[in-house]
């Protein structure tokens, strides 16, 4: 079954599969695909032409821009920004598949991180709380909380500081 909350805007040519829950005040924009067992919490927006594979969790007040690929098994916590054309990848073994046991490990994007446009995040990677990934970067290793990284492969540019990116009143309003 599909559960859709109050005040949800679903634009034209969107496909939503079974066992999906979309909470209140969300937007799902044109031509997007939401696969099975996806949960999208309050006040989040999914951009046009975005593909959200199965078994994905998206937190509160996330902004996922156009043409993004969210692979199976991804966890996107609350207040996450994902720029246009971002690709999240999971484990797809290369080589002889007959002897390979499938293991799906999507990335984990922690609270309040910001991902610039055109970024690629490799399987099983964790992006730390309130970190910033510069546009076009390729993320091959876990990212610590509250740092800025850029490049291919991405490397630390600088620290963000203890205040972080999310304002106190916003944290309080949403219970974080």
Report residues per predicted region.
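Sequence-level detector for tyrosine residue identity
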Residues: 17, 174-176
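Structural signal for interior beta-strand "rungs" in well-ordered beta-sheet cores
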Residues: 1-150, 154-156
